[in-house]
Amino acid sequence: MRVEQVNWVDIPAGLLRRGTPVDEIAAVARRYADIRVPVEWYLKEAPRAEIHVPAFRIARTPVTVGQWARFAAATGRPVPETPADHPVIGVPWEAATAYCRWLGERLGLDVRLPTEDEWERAARGDDGREFPWGEEYRTGLANLLDLGIGTTMPVGSFPDGASPFGVLDMAGNADEWTSTPYAPYPGAPAEVPTTEDWAFDRHITRGGAFRHDRDLARCARRHGAYEEDLEAIGVGFRLAAPAA
């Protein structure tokens, strides 16, 4: 495959069961109590809502080092010293959107980052599942902290962890930028913060990376780039485009 080509997955228009019901947040916090995440962090997922998401396309895997390298050469940006088939990480949001514009010009297509709702629909499908592969967490379906790898792996290494639409690596390996700035969901509990001033960047990331615990791999989990060293925390991105 040429670096300009993208393996697109068509996501049909449909209802997203977005987020987590308010009355289930305490149970979620108990389920992941060993990770010691404050319950307030999970409250950002509330309330549950049914959202219509128009049809779109999303890349089957995150952007790889090999795909990034040609853009980097053309724009004077660094290329990570990791294998070409690994996800590129350490990419600021502005650089990710610049890649989208560059590739879009080459393909004659409106390439962009997915919105937060698009990302969650591609991960959850129609049934509002907890993880891309189903309701229960299973070690070995994603490159997360419990696997003990400690770095990225080739994209698509966990086909059994695919989402209902066949999208890969929606959990683990690389955390992924969306185009959506953080804001509480409409109707959110009063204690949900209105901003995330502590975050290095206000845009939502999704999916978790190789260094993260399993709770960040939950389809509903909303978080951000909490450290300036985006390579250390494994932040990458995947592409979206209008429906064919």
Where are the language model's segments positioned?
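Short, compositionally biased
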Residues: M1-T75, W93-E94, R101, E105, ...
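Functional-site microenvironments in short loops/helix caps that host divalent-cation chemistry
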Residues: I11, R17, V22-A26, R30-E40, ...
